[in-house]
């Protein structure tokens, strides 16, 4: 799959993420809970100020890490002053 992206809700973006993305983060490490596989993604603001994962998101989709209809929980945290993201899939 090409050109896949994940866009977060405005309220979530404003409250939790936008303080980290004054400029895009080109090397956000994203991992799936329960695996050791990590993916490098780009986190940036969309034109309507929502946070958006772009480059690399399609790798998660191609890896069949989750299915349509699954609920995903996104856990952003700082590790050694670096923002990282762990994705939990609730089936």
UniProtKB/Swiss-Prot annotation:
Gene Ontology cellular-component annotations: nucleus
Which keywords does this chain's UniProt record carry? DNA-binding, Nucleus, Transcription, Transcription regulation
**SUPFAM superfamilies annotated for this entry?**
DNA-binding pseudobarrel domain (SSF101936)
Where it sits in the cell: the answer is: Nucleus
DNA binding happens at which residues? 1-91
Name a Pfam family for this protein.
Answer: B3
The GO terms this record gives for MF are: DNA binding
Q: Where is the signal peptide?
A: none
What is the name attached to this protein's record? B3 domain-containing protein Os03g0164300
